[in-house]
Amino acid sequence: MYLQGFGNYHHSEAVKGALPPNQNSPQHCNLGLYAEQLSGTAFTRPRHNNLRSWLYRILPTVTQGTYYPYEFNIMHSFVDEFSPNAMRWSPLYNSSQIKCDFVEGLFHIAGSPLVNTYTYYCNHSMSDKYFANNDGELLFVPYAGEIHLYTEFGKLMLSSGSIAVIPRGVKFKVEVISKEAKGYLCENSGNPLTLPQLGPIGANGLANPRHFQYPVAAFEDSGGEHTIICKNQKKLWFTVCNHSPLNVVAWHGNYAPYCYDLSLFNTINTVSFDHPDPSIFTVLTSESEIPGVSNLDFVIFPPRWMVAEHTFRPPYFHRNYMNELMGLVYGEYDAKKEGFIPGGISIHNCMTPHGPDYESYEIAASQDLKPNYINSLAFMFETKDYWQVTEQAYRHPSRQVDYLNCWQGFKVEFSQ
């Protein structure tokens, strides 16, 4: 059961009467609870941008105890050089992932000043262990397995073909439902993700607000030791407290975790000729200070009909102002016949040439242009800042050092 509607002002209570009816912070909260506000923006942001929620908890967060440096870190140093070369990886695995929970199975791929990308792998649930990211919100893009995200606001269920966003500072734990779970994770430290402007598309299309789902209140009232791991200023810290941090009995507000089924995306594409720019596939965006230039765009290439006439239908050859990191959830990406599989990653930074590989080009340039259904789901994290690759990703055996060879079959066919 979920609450519906992107950015709506929701309210939910797990126990009847837990929400105060007429105010935020009464002298004595109902049921002996404590009122606590969680702000996602500055108090004075314009009303339509202002994010906050009021939580009614068994104990306030100040009782969590003292944080100490954690021996493990998820962020890794970047390579010194900014290579102009295109890069690609097969799915990445480490020996540390033989038995691991969500935090232990994170692999830092690349980052920019306000965005970082990881892959996650987990085959072990977090029982009395919790995670929070003070540095930014987290966007989950699973490609295998099923997980449940237990948050301060309630539970989200997540599997391949859906996404979830955990706001900055919200504590959660990951329960692995399948044998193992794999996915991509994007950390956004810029403006919170929101729906893109539709412009001439009109009032409807792309990701519809009513399809975004928010959790109903649910809480843990358990004693014993509970470990909280917190990412703060690029480092991990931990504390051990005598109660669960997921002790919110009721809440109201517009700053909360949410999930979305990508199959509900209303895809816009050409019904005449040419290949529209990939911005028409934007699901969520983090706006920068420059209008029309995003800090982060989350873009998908979903299942769709391809019907363009007298047109090269796959993505065109391109040198881009923006910086692209791509992944694949399922299927076969229409611009890459080989080498790019679910769990894989490619990075094409500013002005790095990219486009269909030779085999894909040959097929698309000569095929009979009948309506064709593409049954795959690829995605892109696009940023205004350069993707800097981590040392561990650059030196990982999964990096395809021969990636550029996929374009070496092209011949000169020019004739006057």
From Swiss-Prot:
GO terms for cellular component: cytoplasm. Pathway: Amino-acid degradation; L-phenylalanine degradation; acetoacetate and fumarate from L-phenylalanine: step 4/6. Homogentisate binds at Y333, H354. Its cofactor is Fe cation. One of its GO terms (biological process) is L-phenylalanine catabolic process. SUPFAM superfamilies: RmlC-like cupins. It holds the Pfam family HgmA_C. Its EC number is 1.13.11.5. Fe cation binds at H318, E324, H354. It catalyses: homogentisate + O2 = 4-maleylacetoacetate + H(+). Belongs to the homogentisate dioxygenase family. NCBIfam families: hmgA. Hexamer; dimer of trimers. Involved in the catabolism of homogentisate (2,5-dihydroxyphenylacetate or 2,5-OH-PhAc), a central intermediate in the degradation of phenylalanine and tyrosine. Catalyzes the oxidative ring cleavage of the aromatic ring of homogentisate to yield maleylacetoacetate. This is Homogentisate 1,2-dioxygenase. It comes from Legionella pneumophila (strain Corby). The lineage of its organism: Bacteria, Pseudomonadati, Pseudomonadota, Gammaproteobacteria, Legionellales.
